[in-house]
């Protein structure tokens, strides 16, 4: 009888991406594959070609909201739904990429004695994975320092896993897609899957100066394109889909938030990056720690948005471009490969099932 694996994870594109890498690998080996996600999350849009099961879930907020009173009941309902799904599907293993939707799934699996592997993308454990940790068999980390208080028997440092297609990007296709008229270095601006209004405003306030030295590709986020701007050498997108590998490969330098998925993709592509992490006031601080780690390794420049003016932003971008060869040299010293991480994770899953 074929083995079965259930994937879960959602809330952001980063929590879904690793599942999108692994799902075809297991389908290709003849495993039965299904997914458990939320009813309206981004994972429902991204997951294709496998059976998708929706459950009720609450958001694990760190701030005051009236919804906090309802969410425990949603999570309990999600645990019951997950428990019943485990009884029906009878999976051999659960792989969780994190996010609030994963908590009921992990608990439902534990109640059915199904082994669970969770993956933490950031340098510190997210709240969902902290809650899930006692119910899991293995914790796979992206950063070597993650989970310092977790036993070595449970914790495994796997390293980053990114979309394989990003390494197949073509610079000429990227240039053709953007249709830039002048041969200048390309500055790519990425604000994360939801966009970043602060970054958008800073870039638009700096355009006149930045366009003297760069062609600019600006990924703004849904509904955040400013159609009133028509400056030569500046192109805006809400989101870039299948052309993204070509845009990434075309870029000379990148301004980005500091989500784990994005910055490791840039590391694999050896793209000098200026990181502007989400602040501690608007997140749990994981992006600040991710950015600090990359800065210590010499992979990135980091600026904090509450300490930046238009002039300091422009200076930081120009400094990054001037010193880009130094950053590339530092990134060449990173020895982990994407294939290595994928194969190690598959081996861990196979070992747990045995």
Curated annotation (Swiss-Prot):
It comes from the Bacteria. Pfam families: Glyco_tran_28_C, Glyco_transf_28. UDP-N-acetyl-alpha-D-glucosamine binds at residues 12-14, 163, 193, 287. It is a peripheral membrane protein. It catalyses: di-trans,octa-cis-undecaprenyl diphospho-N-acetyl-alpha-D-muramoyl-L-alanyl-D-glutamyl-meso-2,6-diaminopimeloyl-D-alanyl-D-alanine + UDP-N-acetyl-alpha-D-glucosamine = di-trans,octa-cis-undecaprenyl diphospho-[N-acetyl-alpha-D-glucosaminyl-(1->4)]-N-acetyl-alpha-D-muramoyl-L-alanyl-D-glutamyl-meso-2,6-diaminopimeloyl-D-alanyl-D-alanine + UDP + H(+). Its main location: membrane. The keyword Translocase does not apply. Keywords: Cell cycle, Cell division, Cell membrane, Cell shape, Cell wall biogenesis/degradation, Glycosyltransferase, Membrane, Peptidoglycan synthesis, Transferase. GO terms for molecular function: UDP-N-acetyl-D-glucosamine:N-acetylmuramoyl-L-alanyl-D-glutamyl-meso-2,6-diaminopimelyl-D-alanyl-D-alanine-diphosphoundecaprenol 4-beta-N-acetylglucosaminlytransferase activity; undecaprenyldiphospho-muramoylpentapeptide beta-N-acetylglucosaminyltransferase activity. InterPro entries: GlcNAc_MurG, Glyco_trans_28_C, GlycoTrans_28_N. It is found in: Cell membrane. One of its GO terms (cellular component) is plasma membrane. SUPFAM superfamilies: UDP-Glycosyltransferase/glycogen phosphorylase (SSF53756). Pathway: Cell wall biogenesis; peptidoglycan biosynthesis. Coiled coil: none annotated. Its EC number is 2.4.1.227. The keyword Chloroplast does not apply. GO terms for biological process: carbohydrate metabolic process; cell division; cell wall organization; lipid glycosylation; peptidoglycan biosynthetic process; regulation of cell shape. Belongs to the glycosyltransferase 28 family. MurG subfamily. Cell wall formation. Catalyzes the transfer of a GlcNAc subunit on undecaprenyl-pyrophosphoryl-MurNAc-pentapeptide (lipid intermediate I) to form undecaprenyl-pyrophosphoryl-MurNAc-(pentapeptide)GlcNAc (lipid intermediate II). This is UDP-N-acetylglucosamine--N-acetylmuramyl-(pentapeptide) pyrophosphoryl-undecaprenol N-acetylglucosamine transferase 1. The lineage of its organism: Bacteria, Bacillati, Bacillota, Bacilli, Bacillales. The gene is murG1.
């Amino acid at each position: 009888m074929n083995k079965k694996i259930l994937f879960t994870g959602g809330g952001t594109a980063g929590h879904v991406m690793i599942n999108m890498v692994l799902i075809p690998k297991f389908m290709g080996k003849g495993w039965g594959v299904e997914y458990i996600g939320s009813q309206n999350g981004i994972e429902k849009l991204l997951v294709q070609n496998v059976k998708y099961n929706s459950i009720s879930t609450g958001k694990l907020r760190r701030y005051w909201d009236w919804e906090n009173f309802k969410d425990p009941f949603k999570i309990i309902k999600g645990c019951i739904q997950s428990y019943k799904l485990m009884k029906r599907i009878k999976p051999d293993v659960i792989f969780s990429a994190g996010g609030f939707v994963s908590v009921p799934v992990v608990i439902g699996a534990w109640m059915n004695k199904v082994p669970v592997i969770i993956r933490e993308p950031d340098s510190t454990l997210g709240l969902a994975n902290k809650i899930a940790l006692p119910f899991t068999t293995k914790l796979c980390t992206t950063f070597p320092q993650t989970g310092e208080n977790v036993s070595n028997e449970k914790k495994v440092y796997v390293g980053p896993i990114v979309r394989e297609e990003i390494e197949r990007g073509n610079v000429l296709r990227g240039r053709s897609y953007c249709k830039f008229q002048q041969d200048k270095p390309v500055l790519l601006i990425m604000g994360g899957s939801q966009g970043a209004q602060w970054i958008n405003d800073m870039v638009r306030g700096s355009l006149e100066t930045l366009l003297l030295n760069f062609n600019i590709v600006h990924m703004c986020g849904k509904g955040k394109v400013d159609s009133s701007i028509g400056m030569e050498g500046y192109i805006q997108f809400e989101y870039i889909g299948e052309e993204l590998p070509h845009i990434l490969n075309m870029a000379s330098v990148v301004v980005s938030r500091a989500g784990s998925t994005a910055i490791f993709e840039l590391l694999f592509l050896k793209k000098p990056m200026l990181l502007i992490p989400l602040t501690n006031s608007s997140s749990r601080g994981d992006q600040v720690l991710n950015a600090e780690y990359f800065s210590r390794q010499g992979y990135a420049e980091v600026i904090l948005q509450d300490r930046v003016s238009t002039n300091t932003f422009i200076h930081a971008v120009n400094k990054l471009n001037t010193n880009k060869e130094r950053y590339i040299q530092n990134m060449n010293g990173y020895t982990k490969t994407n294939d290595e991480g994928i194969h190690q994770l598959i081996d861990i899953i196979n070992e747990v099932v045995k």
